[in-house]
A protein has these predicted regions:
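Sec/Tat signal peptide C-region and signal peptidase I cleavage site
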Residues: 16-20
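Short helix-capping segments at alpha-helix termini
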Residues: 46-49, 145-150, 189-191, 221, ...
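Pocket-lining segment of extracytoplasmic ligand-binding domains
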Residues: 82, 161-251
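Short, glycine-/small- and polar/acidic-enriched structural segments
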Residues: 22-158, 163-168, 172-180, 195-196, ...
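Secondary-structure end/capping motifs
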Residues: 219-295
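Bacterial N-terminal signal peptides
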Residues: 5-15
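N-terminal secretory signal peptides that target proteins for export/translocation
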Residues: 1-2
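Hinge/cleft segment of the Venus flytrap/periplasmic-binding protein
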Residues: 292, 297-307
Length: 307
């Protein structure tokens, strides 16, 4: 009888639903096609299938989410590889947990009809940015190739308003503009833009968007489940881009426009196919680049940058 009771109790426990783990995820920007694997994983129930209840948060300040993660006030954030190197230099307890976009997207964007035709033309100009630290670091490298330093330009924080501030003449160039988004945004507004691609002007190639967690979460198994969901969502997008676009705009109907359709198509080839794969060599090269340019004080052990 006792064995029967215990067996029934075990079956009842197995039948009871397991409470999903709540995970807060801070984005780097407002929702856009760069975040497609996250949105698709959410809409297809891929997070829920793995016992995760993911709260996706768009920031009011794009520099805020990684610091909230470091402070233990958020579980995970979408961030940038260059920013992670600098944040570790500051002593923030952040670790790479996966890759979302595996190529550079960032560029120095100028008006095609404007006065900046080469990097040396930036002397005396105003450069807009949205995230302090990482973008100013990249500007330093670009200016160096043009024979300039930060003292030769004026850096202006324009927050979200990258292409609008350029089109209005508030600034002469912007850093942090994504080649898959702002170029199209300007064209649709009737203004042609031109990008100086970082990786063609002395900056080593890097992962544009990554997931970061705090060190105390390094061994958390939910991170593996999260990244598995991202990998599956990415494959779904590649296999059925039109069907997944329909699902994406069903969740965010305000994004169903020409700008986002173009950005969706331009972004798909740049998603990390193996988001849990860490390219140590790439991180070593970028850390060396930052040190050579005086942006970090000493070489970083890249194994300590990852979970």
């Amino acid at each position: 009888m006792m064995k029967y009771v215990m067996a029934m109790a075990s079956l009842l426990l197995m039948a009871m639903p397991v409470k999903a783990q709540d995970i807060s995820l801070g984005l780097d920007w407002f929702v856009n096609p760069d975040h497609a694997p996250i949105i698709i994983a959410q809409e297809l129930g891929l997070f829920a299938d793995r016992g995760l209840n993911v709260d996706i948060v768009a920031p009011s300040d794009p520099s805020e989410p990684p610091r909230l993660v470091a402070a233990g006030r958020m579980d995970m954030a979408v961030s940038y590889q260059p920013q992670l190197h600098l944040q570790r230099e500051e002593g923030l307890p952040l670790l790479w947990a996966g890759t979302l976009i595996a190529t550079p997207l960032n560029c120095m964007l100028v008006r095609a009809d404007g006065p900046v035709e080469s990097l040396s033309d930036l002397k005396g100009r105003r450069i807009g940015y949205s995230v302090s630290g990482v973008e100013q670091a990249l500007v330093t490298a670009l200016l160096k190739e043009g024979g300039l330093t930060l003292d030769d330009v004026t850096m202006t924080n324009v927050n979200w308003s990258l292409s609008p501030s350029l089109m209005s003449g508030q600034v002469d160039a912007v850093i942090g503009a994504f080649r898959n988004f702002e170029l199209t945004q300007m064209r649709l507004e009737g203004v042609e833009g031109r990008c100086f691609f970082l990786e063609e002007h002395g900056v080593p190639s890097y992962d544009e968007l990554i997931f970061v967690v705090r060190e105390a979460q390094a061994e958390a198994t939910w991170i593996d489940e999260f990244m598995d969901a991202i990998a599956e969502a990415t494959q779904r997008i590649i296999n059925d881009p039109d069907g997944m676009w329909d699902l994406y705009v069903k969740a965010y109907p305000e994004l169903d426009d020409e700008l986002n359709i173009n950005a969706w198509r331009d972004t798909i080839p740049r998603f990390a196919l193996r988001p849990s794969a860490f390219d140590a060599r790439r991180y070593e090269q970028f850390a060396a680049f930052l040190m050579e340019n005086g942006l970090i004080d000493e070489a970083q052990d890249v194994d300590k940058l990852r979970r």
